[in-house]
């Protein structure tokens, strides 16, 4: 499996290939090769800044002579009018890296900002907000980094770092007990140490899990707030609990107050708006 650094390098290479192709002809025809300049990153919307470290890598990979002065770091609260960084170098390099840097930082900052709003709603409870695998293909590591920068907690990264028995797995395996048994047999055979989470859709399935055991976390899928409270009481701390399914900004606090350990929110990554910012020439 690729490391985070390797994934970032591949992303940057692909992004430059699709964006510049055989050349930025607008810049090449208008800007002399030896022209030098300076641009700053202007924040145009309040939020949480994210993507600074990756932006630095974008500049360094495209043109190692570019000088980046970071004024505001990842995770900081920013407001309209703030200057997050100043970049000095060849004007051609400034122009050709502008859009990729903005695409990354706007996307990551939007996710961090959205996540932080959910985190703030959970203050005073023990509940942590989780992301999901509902991410942009190829950008999962970046988007999950942004969730962490915003104060959220990463769920599993992919299909390889946790067992998550969902409804289809259970149905195809012939029921909850069979599915759990097969997981333990597989993990033993492959000498793997992975946590097991199982999704339940109703109280009958919940009781089957409690009777069987052998899991680390129980996901309460599409339970109402009232049923969540009942389920948490029944589980009584024997397993970690996670609420999932249709939970929104307006309803998340109610679920957290029922005592669940985690709440997963797909909207952190699949329905987010980028944070407004621009990269402008300056003196």
Across the structure, where does each feature detected by a protein language model lie?
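Acidic/glycine-rich phosphate/pyrophosphate-binding loops and surrounding catalytic core
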Residues: 1-212, 217, 226-234, 239-242, ...
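Short secondary-structure boundary segments
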Residues: 221-222, 245, 267-268
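Cys/His-rich Zn2+-binding cysteine-cluster or related metal-binding knuckle/ribbon modules and their
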Residues: 249
């Amino acid at each position: 499996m690729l490391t985070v650094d390797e994934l970032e390098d591949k992303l940057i290479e692909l992004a430059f290939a699709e964006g510049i192709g055989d050349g930025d002809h607008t810049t090449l025809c208008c800007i002399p090769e030896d022209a030098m300049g300076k641009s700053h990153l202007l924040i145009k919307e309040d939020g949480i800044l994210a993507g600074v470290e990756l932006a630095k890598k974008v500049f360094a990979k495209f043109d190692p002579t570019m000088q980046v002065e970071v004024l505001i770091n990842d995770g900081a609260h920013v407001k309209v009018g703030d200057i997050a960084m100043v970049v000095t170098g060849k004007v051609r390099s400034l122009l050709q890296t502008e859009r990729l840097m903005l695409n990354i930082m706007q996307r990551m900052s939007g996710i961090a900002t959205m996540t932080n709003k959910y985190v703030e709603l959970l203050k005073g409870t023990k509940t942590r907000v989780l992301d999901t695998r509902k991410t942009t293909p190829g950008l999962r590591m970046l988007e999950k980094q942004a969730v962490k920068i915003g104060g959220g907690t990463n769920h599993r990264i992919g299909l390889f770092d946790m067992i998550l028995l969902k409804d289809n797995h259970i149905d195809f395996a012939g029921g909850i007990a069979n599915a759990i048994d097969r997981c333990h047999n597989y993990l033993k055979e492959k000498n793997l140490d992975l946590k097991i989470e199982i999704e339940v859709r109703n109280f009958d399935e919940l009781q089957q899990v409690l009777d069987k055991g052998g899991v680390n976390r129980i996901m309460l899928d599409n339970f109402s707030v009232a049923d969540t409270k009942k389920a948490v009481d029944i589980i009584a701390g024997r397993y970690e609990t996670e609420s999932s399914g249709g939970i929104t900004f307006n309803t998340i606090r109610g679920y957290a107050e029922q005592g669940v350990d985690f709440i997963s929110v797909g909207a952190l990554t699949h329905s987010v708006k980028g944070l407004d910012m621009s990269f402008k020439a300056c003196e």
